[in-house]
Regions:
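Membrane-interface amphipathic segments in extracytoplasmic regions
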Residues: 1-175
């Protein structure tokens, strides 16, 4: 999430839509009392020298923000509730949307990256000399994942049934 007082915009960061990349790029022009929430400490959030890919700043100055409970994805109702009306109404609200199919595939890969029960057990089965259909198992795991249901990103840019973001960038149209 970014609250840029210097440029008068709010970045409503969605999930699995290149939000971190956009936030990293936007954060480079933030300064002063702008707010940029910190990223989780994953290796892909660091550059080749090990430094952070974006400038986290001032998030701890927000009395309502808590890294463990709110994190870097702050939905529209929460932001509206906590920001002064002149900021919520007067700043440009930016967000990003992604094709739902691409997003769910990305979400599946992200959520299951460390879940051994969702990964094909190819090595074990090959050691036993049993033929293995890795693609079939992956498909079954993906179907199970999709059937559990997943949250949309609507809460970040839709408020009271209406689009509240002034600009919604389509992931597929970025280059």
């Amino acid at each position: 999430m970014i609250i840029s007082h210097s440029h008068k915009y709010l970045f409503l960061k969605t999930v699995k839509t290149a939000g971190t990349s956009i936030e990293a790029a936007l954060s480079q022009s933030c300064s002063g009392n702008d707010v940029v929430t910190p990223l989780n400490d994953f290796s892909h959030n660091r550059d080749e020298t090990g430094g952070a890919v974006h400038r986290a700043m001032n998030a701890d100055t927000l009395p309502w923000w808590n890294r463990d409970q709110i994190g870097q994805h702050v939905d529209a109702p929460t932001m509206k509730r906590h920001l002064p009306p002149e900021v919520w109404q007067g700043y440009c609200k930016l967000s990003i949307a992604r094709n739902p199919w691409d997003r769910i595939v990305s979400l599946f890969a992200w959520k299951t990256r460390n879940d051994a029960t969702m990964k094909p057990q190819k090595r074990l089965i090959h050691r036993l000399g049993v033929p293995f259909d890795e693609l079939g198992e992956l498909r079954r795991n993906f179907t199970t994942f999709v059937n559990r249901g997943f949250e949309t990103n609507d809460r970040f840019y839709i408020l009271d049934g209406e689009l509240c973001a002034d600009v919604v960038v389509r992931y597929e149209q970025m280059n």
